[in-house]
């Protein structure tokens, strides 16, 4: 695993010479920072296919996960305002009373959920200093056995990645680069992974290498740092994250 990530990183450095204007990719399959969503969306008709390696601290429920895993997702942007994403997160069998013993330690199932974002105001729209404003939701339904119309997402139900949010983003030209300031109010009322309150993030793209986007955020729960590296005219994006400065997650995205 470490060798694979090293090869991808070296490839990004060697090939990442094309100037781009990319957005960071949230580990949940939506445009954002690292864990925290922001108010940005992709360009109209953008199609993204991505996958993440997620450390166990990045996951919302220890009883269901409690182990490192992977996810993969499909994301589509419509009308230059709307993002819709479908995310699948792999699950290993474990001795928690649900899985048969033959599945212990093996990837045997996956959690599936949708996420969506509506950008109400674009940055600079109506007024040159106007920040972007967006609202959205992740994992808005729950259920089992084929019943996914249950809206009881709070508490301890199956909607492990549930949250709704209101986000604002604004970018500034500063010496030697472009600075992004992001604020997001999140709410989920979950027992297992509470994300309730105001999160914030800072992104910085240096002028000397615009393929690189440095990120720090607080998602209301943890302080995270990371970077996004873009290559091949922004068709490939590699994301590296240190949750709480020590737990590694990484992503590769194609669009």
Task: Tell what function each PLM region has.
Residues 8, 15, 31, 49, ...:
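Feature targets compositionally biased, intrinsically disordered low-complexity regions
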Residues 89, 138-140, 184-188, 219-221, ...:
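Active-site beta-loop-alpha junctions enriched in small/polar residues
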Residues 197-241, 249-253:
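Outer membrane beta-barrel transmembrane domains
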Residues 1-30:
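Cleavable N-terminal export/targeting peptides
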Residues 24-164, 169-175, 208, 227-229, ...:
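Transmembrane beta-barrel domains of Gram-negative outer membranes and organellar outer membranes
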Residues 152-219:
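Detector for outer-membrane/organellar transmembrane beta-barrel domains
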Residues 79-81, 222, 245-247:
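A generic structural motif
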Residues 28-32, 37, 45, 182-186, ...:
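Glycine-centered flexibility motif
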């Amino acid at each position: 695993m470490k060798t694979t990530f090293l090869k991808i990183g070296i490839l990004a450095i060697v090939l990442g010479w094309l100037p781009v204007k990319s957005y960071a990719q949230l580990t949940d399959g939506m445009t954002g920072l690292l864990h925290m969503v922001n108010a940005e969306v992709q360009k109209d008709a953008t199609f993204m296919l991505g996958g993440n390696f997620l450390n166990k601290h990045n996951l919302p429920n220890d009883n269901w996960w409690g182990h490192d895993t992977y996810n993969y997702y499909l994301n589509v942007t419509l009308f230059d305002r709307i993002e819709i994403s479908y995310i699948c997160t792999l699950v290993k069998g474990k001795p928690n009373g649900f899985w048969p013993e033959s599945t212990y330690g093996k990837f045997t199932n996956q959690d599936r959920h949708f996420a969506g974002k509506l950008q109400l105001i674009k940055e600079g729209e109506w007024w040159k200093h106007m920040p972007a404003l967006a609202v959205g939701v992740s994992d808005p339904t729950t259920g089992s056995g084929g019943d996914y119309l249950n809206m009881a997402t709070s508490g301890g139900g199956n909607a492990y990645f549930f949250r709704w949010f209101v986000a604002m983003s604004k970018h500034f030209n500063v010496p030697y680069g472009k600075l992004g300031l992001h604020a997001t109010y999140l709410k989920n009322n979950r027992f297992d992974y509470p994300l309730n309150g105001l999160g914030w993030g800072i992104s910085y793209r240096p002028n000397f290498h615009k393929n690189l986007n440095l990120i720090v955020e607080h998602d209301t729960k943890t302080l995270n740092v990371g970077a996004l590296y873009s290559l091949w005219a922004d068709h490939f994006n590699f994301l590296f994250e240190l949750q709480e400065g020590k737990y590694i997650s990484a992503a590769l995205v194609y669009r």
